[in-house]
């Protein structure tokens, strides 16, 4: 198993949930955490523990992004007018690597980060190699022509594992998508329950 796959499944085991709904996730066959103490009976979590778990789960889902990046996203959401939890999710979903993953150009969010890093993606006709790049409504995201025949891309597009959300308009044949609008939390096709309100409580306490 590659280091990247190992990291992904370690997050699943730590959270005790199949974060991305992947059929090969180890939690499909066992429900305890990683390591030699993973099978110990879990005690009831404190409010802080639940808040921390919610934060770690959301960070993990988006490719285990750094605390610095995640906190910066929260700070931006809290400065904007509106529901901070909804805004946090909208900002996370507008990341370029998240949109590339939603479009099924790649099989995992980890692969999406690497795919963007390696220069395989254009935004509005310009190559962008920053996974955390913030897309705006109306932006056109596409796989570069030279990268469209990659087995990774073709296999991911054929996968039935994920549904395309309504806030992304995809032309799968052209490998091009438009980020239509910022999503509402209820629209995001998470495979598990996310609790952004607990994340807000974590940073607000």
Curated annotation (Swiss-Prot):
Pfam families given in the database record: Ribosomal_S4 (PF00163), S4 (PF01479)
Spans annotated as Disordered: 1-44
Gene Ontology CC terms: small ribosomal subunit
Protein name per its UniProtKB record: Small ribosomal subunit protein uS4
Gene3D superfamilies in the record: Ribosomal Protein S4 Delta 41, Chain A, domain 1, RNA-binding S4 domain
CDD domains (UniProt xref): S4
InterPro entries assigned: Ribosomal_uS4, Ribosomal_uS4_bac-type, Ribosomal_uS4_CS, Ribosomal_uS4_N, S4_RNA-bd, S4_RNA-bd_sf
All residue ranges annotated as the S4 RNA-binding domain in the record: 94-173
Classification lineage: Bacteria, Pseudomonadati, Pseudomonadota, Alphaproteobacteria, Maricaulales
Organism: Maricaulis maris (strain MCS10)
Annotated function: One of the primary rRNA binding proteins, it binds directly to 16S rRNA where it nucleates assembly of the body of the 30S subunit.
Known partners and oligomeric status: Part of the 30S ribosomal subunit. Contacts protein S5. The interaction surface between S4 and S5 is involved in control of translational fidelity.
Similarity-based family: Belongs to the universal ribosomal protein uS4 family.
Keywords for this protein: Ribonucleoprotein, Ribosomal protein, RNA-binding, rRNA-binding
Lineage top rank: taxon: Bacteria
Molecular-function GO term, any one: structural constituent of ribosome
GO BP of this protein: ribosomal small subunit biogenesis; translation
